[in-house]
Amino acid sequence: MSPSGFYAWRTRPESARTQEDRRLKVLMHASFTGGRGYYGSPRIQDDFLEWGEHVSRKRIIRLMQEEGLQARVRKRYKVTTDSDHDQPIADNLLQQDFTADRPNQRWVGDTSELRIGENGKAYLAVILDLYSRFVVGWAISAVNDRHLTIKALEMALKRRCPGLGLLHHSDQGSTYASEDYQDVLAAYGITCSMSRRGNCYDNAVMEAFFSTVKSEIGEWFASHGDAKAELFDYIEVFYNQRRRHSAAGRMSPAAYERRLTHAA
């Protein structure tokens, strides 16, 4: 190429598509950053639509590749269920129907193990509302016992004040089957449902939640204090209020529930 030709190539105006790509990349980075680096093309596209930008998934994928943006891969969580006990086991009333017509109709709960420091452990108990996937209750402790799960349940009850007709589903673990835990459920008129023994699909929503948590913020923390602080920020500030969820109409759990309130 001649010097004049090279100069002409270097100084020619950008095409309209190149200019548009550059503009979209700014928005894409805003979405990716707002999603704390957890968003892939589907949720970035949701942000674009909310901002009035109609961009194909294929184009977003291309732009993400050009910018080196990649969402984190989901991990499986470590099972902590202790089903070897003599407590009564409730029937599986949920039957893998993870839908709900309104808040406080169906809750699911489970516990997962976290790593603390070099050799330590902690346990995170969570209760989700199946209507919106809102985390209604959670607690963290160095000991996986009934006090941990009851603490998460008490947070959920205080936060939501559910009426009659609520179904609570969990695995058959001793912390959920314990007399103390069952007494709290009974006191609030909550019906208990439990997964079949060893069947993770009966509580698949909770498995998916913990996998999301561990892929997005990890499962190792320097201390119990750090774990509690990071989980508070992730659950209360990000997950419930901002993180888009496919089961909540691609909205955040809080936004999905506000939609119901406005409709009423």
Per-range role (PLM):
Residues 1-264:
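Charged DNA-binding/catalytic regions of mobile-element recombinases
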